[in-house]
Amino acid sequence: VIPYYQQFIQRFPTIFDLAKAPIDEVLHYWTGLGYYARARNLHKSAQYVVSNLNGEFPSCVSDLIELPGVGRSTAGAISAIAFKQKAAILDGNVKRVLSRFSATVGWPGKTIVTKKLWAVAEAYTPSERVADYTQAMMDLGATICTRSAPKCSVCPIMRECVAYKQNKVNDPASLVFNW
């Protein structure tokens, strides 16, 4: 993936370069980087930022959500990682970590469960080193607090994890863990 990313960045080093490029060229350089819908949204977002914001990328969650393809979690990740602003995230990996950590019961696609998980995410997101925390939470869910074979013995938050304390990490009757 890295060579494809480097090629993409070399061709479109600025938001202005990306905004003025034809979509077919953007898609060509996106080859090898994943979902093409992301490339289309990135292109539309670049055009929006150049046309409406004088090329200044927004930094706060409420403004980032206005960009095509950017939802609350992506906006939070951008705000936290790129701009070091306190902003919660709740991608699939983080949902799994926080649902186990807080023993939140229910399918995360349900509005009430999602609201609970957002509240947990917001409560635990620190004001300092927010970029490190955000990346760590995503990595924790991707590598340790995995869907089917969590590695609780090496988890840095194991001692505070309610599901671990209650021996319910993989209990389908009590927690959603298989997503």
Question: What are the functions of these language-model segments?
Answer:
Residues V1-S153, I157-V169, L175:
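Catalytic cores of DNA base-excision repair glycosylases
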Residues N178-W179:
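Short Gly/Pro-enriched turn/cap motifs at secondary-structure boundaries
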